Each structure stands twice: as structure tokens, then as C-alpha cells.
Amino acid sequence: ATFSZAPPGBZKAGQKIFKLKCAQCHTVEKGAGHKQGPNLNGLFGRQSGTAAGYSYSAANKNMAVVWZZBTLYDYLLNPKKYIPGTKMVFPGLKKPQDRADLIAYLKESTA
């Protein structure tokens, strides 16, 4: 299923998911540093592997995907399948609602 078929995302629910599953490795605020994973500020419309100052895997750089709702929706289902060789150890979010919620939160928090 694609993002266009996903349920509407809930930003508040997405924030909870981010805190539980993503914040250990990622920040969203402008100017916040990289952690184990890159800072996600300005994520939408950015090509994978291009946040300045973060050491990406070759796989992430070479994938050259542009992050939008639809690409994030597919990626977050199974990151290792979407970008084989990625350093991201997160197994993914299987539930469409969880992915839609997280994307709604990221859309606001990284802008």
C-alpha cells in the first residue's frame, strides 16, 4: 500500500512514536546536532545521504532518494529492505497508522 492509501496521520500520536522509537538516534530541531543518526531538520525535499556533517553509509548516499511522504512511508516500513546497507538499525513500523502518524509529526517538526 502507498502513502496515498494511508490513513490520515495524527501529529500528536506521531510525536509519541518519535520519542519512543526515533529520538534516541535523531533530533528534529534546526541547529541540533547529529546523534547516532542524522538531524532530520529540513528532511522533506532533501536527498538521502546529504545532511551536512553526518557520516552516511555509501548505500544511503547512493540511493539518492528524495524524502517526501510517499518515500518515507515506504522506507519506514522496512528501512533495511528499502536501502540495503543502511546504518539505521531500526526494524521499521509495520502499521500504516503508525507510519502516517510519524510522517505527520516529522512534516511539522522538521520544517
UniProtKB/Swiss-Prot annotation:
GO molecular function terms attached to this record: electron transfer activity; heme binding; metal ion binding
Q: Which residues carry this modification: N6,N6,N6-trimethyllysine?
A: 80, 94
| Listed InterPro entries | Cyt_c-like_dom (IPR009056), Cyt_c-like_dom_sf (IPR036909), Cyt_c_1A/1B (IPR002327)
List GO terms (cellular component aspect).
mitochondrial intermembrane space
- Where heme c binds, per the record, is at 22, 25-26, 88
Major location (coarse): mitochondrion
Compartment(s) where it occurs, according to its Swiss-Prot or TrEMBL record: Mitochondrion intermembrane space
Tell me the first and last residues of the signal peptide: none
Q: Which residues carry this modification: Hydroxyproline?
A: 79
Cite the entry's keywords alphabetically.
Acetylation, Electron transport, Heme, Hydroxylation, Iron, Metal-binding, Methylation, Mitochondrion, Respiratory chain, Transport
Recount the PTM note.
Binds 1 heme c group covalently per subunit. It is not sure whether methylation is on Lys-80 or Lys-81.
- As stated in the Swiss-Prot or TrEMBL entry, residues carrying the post-translational modification N-acetylalanine are 1
Name the job this protein performs: Electron carrier protein. The oxidized form of the cytochrome c heme group can accept an electron from the heme group of the cytochrome c1 subunit of cytochrome reductase. Cytochrome c then transfers this electron to the cytochrome oxidase complex, the final protein carrier in the mitochondrial electron-transport chain.
PANTHER family recorded for this chain? CYTOCHROME C (PTHR11961)
Q: Which family does it belong to?
A: Belongs to the cytochrome c family.
Q: Please, what other remarks does the record include? A: There are amides at two of the three positions 5, 10, and 11 and at one of the three positions 68, 69, and 70.
Question: What name does UniProt use for this protein?
Answer: Cytochrome c
Native species: Allium porrum (Leek)
* Organism lineage string: Eukaryota, Viridiplantae, Streptophyta, Embryophyta, Tracheophyta
